[in-house]
Amino acid sequence: MKNKKLLVMAGGTGGHVFPAIAVAQTLQKQEWDICWLGTKDRMEAQLVPKYGIPIRFIQISGLRGKGIKALLNAPFAIFRAVLQAKKIIQEEKPDAVLGMGGYVSGPAGVAAKLCGVPIILHEQNAIAGLTNKLLGKIATCVLQAFPTAFPHAEVVGNPVREDLFEMPNPDIRFSDREEKLRVLVVGGSQGARVLNHTLPKVVAQLADKLELRHQVGKGAVEEVSQLYGENLEQVKITEFIDNMAEAYAWADVVICRSGALTVCEIAAVGVAAIFVPFQHKDRQQYLNAKYLSDVDAAKIIEQADLTPEMLVNYLKNLTRENLLQMALKAKTMSMPNAAQRVAEVIKQYSN
């Protein structure tokens, strides 16, 4: 008997791609075939094949910040992308499609509807992106990570890597910690220059109280090392951290952006956080961060308000007991079965 097949529509950023990979891997273990639809010039083109998943491409890009010519051409570009996606869907014959966001899922979702293939949507953020808002009207089933994106969609959490849930619980991790507070600073793929420039000034005032790991992003190690100056021995600086689960588990508190995936990873491990949301016009990251700050598992500092002095005052007053309580609250907000639940819904609605 032929295996069932899922076509994944996701691309652009890790926040869309990594949760989709987690769902794909769950279904692969259940003898499903997976095919991916993306764009050639975004991260999925390099990343997805590393997981042994075949990928096909359509031509589409975002319109935000583009000139008038691009806007005038947009209807033709979208129509062309729908036709390209329709051809691929007719060739691949999937039993269901999973839309996880990114430009690619718009035209691909319309093509799936035209081909009569069930559409399962998953919204990773606390506020729905434009593509998912539109696709939500034609989708067979809509799922969401946070309870605020769609009024009646099932809340399943964000599918995150299994190794995050395998870390020891916060009370076990904290049981033998007596030395300096451990601070993990994650600039993320957007670099978060604001964190790279602020933290060296914080450490200059609190060097005797903090031990830092700082992920600075691509090409920033030398510049940030110079900013730390004489306090460099208190800090472990890296471009990227390969084992994020271990890094989160090492930390007493994480200072980072609040992309949807990051918020759910922090909940999965159970660690306190100071979120500095990226200043997006629809407040996406701020609303993601509220998922944990509303239960006192995290603090939000708006980028406009972030100063070294403010961070020094906040960190100075933190105790390990405070941070353990925050970590335990974060852990209660995690949803360890997200990938499994999305996979179940796909199986339920598939042709």
Curated annotation (Swiss-Prot):
One of its GO terms (cellular component) is plasma membrane. It catalyses: di-trans,octa-cis-undecaprenyl diphospho-N-acetyl-alpha-D-muramoyl-L-alanyl-D-glutamyl-meso-2,6-diaminopimeloyl-D-alanyl-D-alanine + UDP-N-acetyl-alpha-D-glucosamine = di-trans,octa-cis-undecaprenyl diphospho-[N-acetyl-alpha-D-glucosaminyl-(1->4)]-N-acetyl-alpha-D-muramoyl-L-alanyl-D-glutamyl-meso-2,6-diaminopimeloyl-D-alanyl-D-alanine + UDP + H(+). It comes from Haemophilus influenzae (strain 86-028NP). Pathway: Cell wall biogenesis; peptidoglycan biosynthesis. Pfam families: Glyco_tran_28_C (PF04101), Glyco_transf_28 (PF03033). This is UDP-N-acetylglucosamine--N-acetylmuramyl-(pentapeptide) pyrophosphoryl-undecaprenol N-acetylglucosamine transferase. Belongs to the glycosyltransferase 28 family. MurG subfamily. Keywords: Cell cycle, Cell division, Cell inner membrane, Cell membrane, Cell shape, Cell wall biogenesis/degradation, Glycosyltransferase, Membrane, Peptidoglycan synthesis, Transferase. InterPro entries: GlcNAc_MurG, Glyco_trans_28_C, GlycoTrans_28_N. It is a peripheral membrane protein. It is found in: Cell inner membrane. One of its GO terms (biological process) is carbohydrate metabolic process. PANTHER family: GLYCOSYLTRANSFERASE (PTHR21015:SF22), UDP-N-ACETYLGLUCOSAMINE--N-ACETYLMURAMYL-(PENTAPEPTIDE) PYROPHOSPHORYL-UNDECAPRENOL N-ACETYLGLUCOSAMINE TRANSFERASE 1 (PTHR21015). GO terms for molecular function: UDP-N-acetyl-D-glucosamine:N-acetylmuramoyl-L-alanyl-D-glutamyl-meso-2,6-diaminopimelyl-D-alanyl-D-alanine-diphosphoundecaprenol 4-beta-N-acetylglucosaminlytransferase activity; undecaprenyldiphospho-muramoylpentapeptide beta-N-acetylglucosaminyltransferase activity. Cell wall formation. Catalyzes the transfer of a GlcNAc subunit on undecaprenyl-pyrophosphoryl-MurNAc-pentapeptide (lipid intermediate I) to form undecaprenyl-pyrophosphoryl-MurNAc-(pentapeptide)GlcNAc (lipid intermediate II). It comes from the Bacteria. Its EC number is 2.4.1.227. Its main location: membrane. NCBIfam families: murG. It is an enzyme of class 2 (transferase).
